Amino acid sequence: LSKKNLGYGAANNKIIRKSKTPYVFILSPDVILKKNCEKNLLKSADKLNDFSIISPISQYKDYDLLKSSISETEEVQGFAMLISKKKILRVGMFDEKIFLYAEETDLCRRLKLANEKIYINKNAKVTHLAAKSTNIGFEFDKCRNWHWMWSQVYFSKKYSNNFYVYFKFIILLLIQFIKIIFYITLFNKKEIINKTMRFSGTLNSLLGRSSWYRPKHNFD
C-alpha cells in the first residue's frame, strides 16, 4: 500500500480507509494466531454487535482470572485488534502524529471518552513475539528509545495538565542527562547512545516538535 514507512497509526489508517468490510483485523507481523482465533473474534463481534474493539489475549497476562469469556476493558494492546470501522472512523482513527508507541492507548482513550465499548475475548488467543517484527538491531533500539519517550510526553500533554507534564518531564530530562554523563565515565557507548536518544525524544516532544526520527534502514 505504501513504499514509505508511515508509522503504525498512519499505516493502519490507510488500510482502514481502503477496507470495504464492517470490521478490520489489525495484526502486527510478530504475532502468531492460535487455533480458531479469528473465528472466535468474529463470533463475539456478531454476539456483541455494539463494540469498537475486540482483542484476543496474549501469553503475557493472566486472563484466567476473568469470569466471562468476553469482558469489557479500558484499553487493549495494539498488536492484535478486531475493530469496528464505523466506530473507529467516528473518533478520527489513529492519531497520525504518533509514529511509534501509545497509538492504541490514545485510540482507546478517545473511544472511552466517546462512551464506546472495548472488549477482550479470552477464547481468542495469540502469541506476541514482541519487537521481532523488525530485524535491524541497534538501529531499532535507537528508534525505540527515541519514540518511546516522544510518545509518552505527547500523550501526557494531550490528556493531562500541561504544568504538571512539563515539570515531570523536565525533571526526567535532568535525570536522563545525569545518566548520559554517568555512562560517558564508563565508556559505555551503547548506553550513551540509548540514553541520548531518550533525552532527545523527551526534549523534542516537550518543545512540540514532530515525531521526526527514523532509523537508518530501508524498509522498502
Where are these regions (language model features)?
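Short aromatic/hydrophobic "clamp" motif used to bind/position activated sugar donors
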Residues: V24
